[in-house]
Swiss-Prot record:
Annotated residues for binding of Zn(2+) 1: H14, H16, K100, D248
Cellular component, GO annotation: cytosol
GO biological process annotation, one example: 'de novo' pyrimidine nucleobase biosynthetic process
Organism: Parasynechococcus marenigrum (strain WH8102)
Name this polypeptide is given: Dihydroorotase
Family: Belongs to the metallo-dependent hydrolases superfamily. DHOase family. Class II DHOase subfamily.
Record's keyword annotation contains Metal-binding: yes
Taxonomic classification: Bacteria, Bacillati, Cyanobacteriota, Cyanophyceae, Synechococcales
Length: 343
């Protein structure tokens, strides 16, 4: 019998499910193994109101396979003009789980994001007062800052001062990519956590150029030097409850990736848990996978852990070149663990 690991069913604390036809193509892969997911609001137009979030949630549920137990956790897209009252209403009514801060033009569909943190001071104070978490894409967008330094600069220029002004605000530093981010989160005593993606644990910036330009490895924040990847692996597998799973699975049509100006995003949902399992096995930390994938996130958000389980088995699984017409992370590779029941 193959070696097995049974854990509390996991959640994905950062995913892009898109909308319309793309939503129909991808949502089943997230719902396959994650019971809940924090859904990003950067649609066109973005999800900026309670009514828009409620409508989007309904579309997600309609697109889910019949009989699948999956709960989308909705987020509000913050702008310079976000209304604190609308945010509070959505949070109190259980429509919003959190609010998302995109610095304007930092990533896909972020043009309507926040241009200056001073513009949303009232919003952040209200969120702090009601216990509504703030999710941050932590990069500066200044033209004079190297793209590989944008996360580290964001910590120094913005995140430290934001947390000083709002010490009771719960903050998730999303999809961290650097040693500096690991150290900053690890030195914080409360109200700060971070999500880590499978691709930032698996590849470094050399991977984007291995044998040519690998557009399917282009994401934002971009993958970094090897020392940063190793720091992320240490954090993820450490058992530290401040770090938890967030895939940042971000699908794009092949025509949008394989072009002269390709889109940022890696579609990792189909084999996300298998990818994380490979990392934890390589780091001899399988005993910490349940915490990272299933327990730390709910604890930070003040939610109960799921009451069912999933089982991984040490049986090789071949990742296809295409999944529903999209290129998945690990395309053409073999992963050593698979989720039961397999796809």
């Amino acid at each position: 019998m193959a070696e097995q690991l049974t854990i509390t069913a996991p959640d994905d604390w950062h995913v892009h499910l898109r909308d319309e036809e793309m939503l129909e193509r991808v949502v089943a892969y997230t719902a396959r193994c994650f019971r809940r997911a924090i859904v990003m609001p950067n649609l066109r137009p973005p999800v900026t109101t309670v009514d828009a979030a409620r409508s989007y949630r309904d579309r997600i549920l309609s697109a889910c396979p019949e009989g699948v137990a999956f709960t989308p956790l909705m987020t509000a897209y913050l702008t310079d003009n976000s209304d604190p009252d609308d945010l509070e209403r959505g949070f109190q009514e259980g429509v919003y789980t959190a609010a998302k801060l995109y610095p304007a033009n930092a990533t896909t569909n972020s043009a309507a994001g926040v241009t200056d943190l001073d513009q949303i001071g009232r919003v952040l104070s209200r969120m702090e007062a009601i216990g509504m978490p703030l999710l941050i894409h932590g990069e500066v967008t200044d033209a004079d800052v190297d793209v590989f330094d944008r996360e580290a600069v964001f910590i120094e220029r913005h995140l430290k001062s934001l947390r000083t002004r709002h010490p009771e605000l719960k903050v998730v530093f999303e999809h961290i990519t650097t040693e500096q981010a690991v150290d900053y989160v690890g030195s914080s005593d409360r109200n700060l956590a971070a999500t880590i993606t499978p691709h930032h644990l698996q590849i470094n910036r050399n991977s984007m150029f291995l044998g040519g330009l690998r557009s399917d490895f282009y994401c934002l924040p971009v993958v970094k030097r090897e020392r940063h990847r190793l720091a992320l692996r240490r954090a993820a597998t450490s058992g530290d409850p401040r770090f938890f799973l967030g895939t940042d699975s971000a699908p794009h049509p092949r025509a949008g990736k394989e072009t002269s100006c390709g889109c940022a995003g890696i579609f990792n949902a189909p084999f996300a848990l298998e990818s994380y399992a490979q990392v934890f096995a390589e780091e001899e930390a399988m005993h910490h996978l349940e915490g990272f994938a299933s327990l730390h996130g709910p604890a930070f958000y003040g939610l109960p852990a799921n009451n069912d389980t999933v089982t991984l088995e040490k049986v090789a699984v071949d990742v296809p070149e295409l999944v529903n017409g999209l290129v998945p992370f690990h395309a053409g590779e073999t992963l050593p663990w698979r989720l039961q029941p397999c796809m």
